Amino acid sequence: FLIKKNNAELISKIKNEVNGAIFPEENAKYSDPTFITALATRLNLTISIDNGIMHMVGLADNPMIVLFGPTDSEKFAPKYSNIKILDSKKIYNTEDISKISEKDVLDLL
């Protein structure tokens, strides 16, 4: 999981719910955009929300599923060939990203 270190509560929740969850930045001596982008080149697939980390990972041009809620997917989605978009506004007519289900994501795999 690539999550900003200041999201301690979310990291703790994921560790409790996902057996064997890995957070590479916890063990790194540094963390910056080049580190995230370099790690991304090692990934087979990324599932992300619309955020800064997603844009850094997108530079690796690996397959990616990006979830959008209130932000405009037409404007902010990366323009790479391997990107699949799930936009809650288009699917469920709401800005509530939590309406996107696990099934929605799994259907794109």
Which ranges hold each PLM region?
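Nucleotide-sugar donor-binding patch of glycosyltransferase catalytic domains
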Residues: 55-109
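Donor-binding and catalytic core of enzymes assembling or modifying cell-surface/extracellular glycoconjugates
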Residues: 1-73
